[in-house]
């Protein structure tokens, strides 16, 4: 892309990814009636980790995303892809 450095492009993509995961995790957790503490307990992670993910301050590892998807009974892609709106 002309005019933008690779570093700027990567930073923008990373920020968008963190925002998507944050939004999806909040939505899925709420839909299933879990508190941050309960989700963290079941997934074997710290509650602060859930909070940091949901606030977009932490990019979870693949292992953490997998644990969350198992507990939330969803596909991994449900956590990392923006929800599509129906037309």
Predicted regions and their residues:
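Helix-turn-helix DNA-binding elements, focusing on the entry/boundary residues of the two helices
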Residues: 25, 36, 47, 62-65
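Alpha-helical residues within the helix-turn-helix
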Residues: 30, 41, 70
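Short amphipathic recognition helices of helix-turn-helix/homeodomain-type DNA-binding modules
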Residues: 78-87
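DNA major-groove recognition helix of helix-turn-helix/homeodomain DNA-binding modules
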Residues: 63-78
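Residue-level detection of the helix-turn-helix DNA-binding "recognition helix"
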Residues: 30, 44, 55-57, 84
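Short alpha-helical DNA-recognition segment
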Residues: 33-52
